[in-house]
Each structure stands twice: as C-alpha cells, then as structure tokens.
Amino acid sequence: MADRRKIGTKDKWKEKTWYTIVAPSFLGEREIALSPAADPSLMIGRKVEVPVSDFTGNFRKSSTMVIFRVKECTGKRCTTEFIGHKVSDDTIRRMVRRRKERIDIIMPSKTKDGYRLVIKIVLVSDSKLTANKRGEVRSKIIGFINERCGSMTLPELAQYIIGDNVYNDIVDTLKDVYPIKKIEIRKSEVLGRDGYVEEPGAQTQIEAQ
C-alpha cells in the first residue's frame, strides 16, 4: 500500500514552469522577478513589489516600493502594469516626532488618460498650525496633485511620483502658505480606468529578485 502511494505521488514543483516577470515599458521592461505556475493563465493578476532604488539608483528610497501586477504572458515572459506605490511605515514614523504636527491628506484623482487613483500624502510641520492654516495647506496640496494628475498619463505620473522632483514641487507650492519641509506621498493606488472593466485574476504577491 505504501509503495502504491509513493508511485502515485507527483512532484508539483516539477510540473510548474518558471516565468520571467518584467517591468512596464516606461521603466525599461527590465526583469524584476521569477515566479512558478502550472499554467500561464495563473500568472495573470499576480503582484510584484520592487524597491524604487532598483530603478532610480537612489538608495535613500529603498523603503519605497513600486507595485506592479501581471497583465499578460507570452511564452515564459510576463508583462506588468503599474498599480501603485507605498512608503514603509517605519519611514513615516521617523518623519513624525514629538512636538511636530502631522497632516494627512487622502484624495481621489484622475490622470489625463482616464486612470482613477487614490493618493495619500503626509506632511509634518515644525509647529502646530491653526485650523485656517491647515485648511490652506490641504487646499494647496489637493489643487497641486489634481493639476499634475490631470496633465499626465499614468506612466508619466508613476515616474513623477517615484522621482525626486515631486518633493521640490510640493515645497515650492507651499512656500507662500507655510514652509513645510517634511513631505511624503506615502501611497498611491490605481483603482481602474474609465471605460474599462478589470478582469479578475490571481492575487499572489511575489517578492522581487
């Protein structure tokens, strides 16, 4: 009986194929991960998180992760789409210290090519702000983000968010309201695109190489 069970046992790993996952074209289609699957259809929808530093070489941003989702497989090669980014909780905690005021902004926005997003921003001021001043800061930030999103495609916005210019631009936007120096777009999430229906797929998360 034991021998029969042994003969009938299959090595599931040997039945799987390893697929190469690549970044979107606006990030050079570089290889970002390898993942096994029994069928290429099972790769669709899998998520991969990659440090921003892997793309920019800026190791100060190694705690910021870009998030991709597999959208198509050809042979053993799988292409992805950008679906957001996130900054580690430890990085945000280090930003906020005692006697500092934290301002959180969570806002919806839309790119010029119709992608809907939620963007989360955290700012830290050196002193407590009045209610009016906080309102001015929020209004300026929301107006700035909506203007940038509305003037960019999703690939352009993704590159902008993970780059260095966005920080300087926000500081410049706020200089006439309050000189806030600690700013982070801590998370972005793509919700969908106008006129498109998202197809369900696997939701496995894959570690980048």
Curated annotation (Swiss-Prot):
<dbReference type="GO" id="GO:0006412">
    <property type="term" value="P:translation"/>
</dbReference>
<protein>
    <recommendedName>
        <fullName>Small ribosomal subunit protein eS1</fullName>
    </recommendedName>
</protein>
<keyword id="KW-0689">Ribosomal protein</keyword>
<dbReference type="GO" id="GO:1990904">
    <property type="term" value="C:ribonucleoprotein complex"/>
</dbReference>
<dbReference type="GO" id="GO:0003735">
    <property type="term" value="F:structural constituent of ribosome"/>
</dbReference>
<keyword id="KW-0687">Ribonucleoprotein</keyword>
<dbReference type="GO" id="GO:0005840">
    <property type="term" value="C:ribosome"/>
</dbReference>
<dbReference type="Pfam" id="PF01015">
    <property type="entry name" value="Ribosomal_S3Ae"/>
</dbReference>
<dbReference type="InterPro" id="IPR001593">
    <property type="entry name" value="Ribosomal_eS1"/>
</dbReference>
<dbReference type="InterPro" id="IPR030838">
    <property type="entry name" value="Ribosomal_eS1_arc"/>
</dbReference>
<comment type="similarity">
    <text>Belongs to the eukaryotic ribosomal protein eS1 family.</text>
</comment>
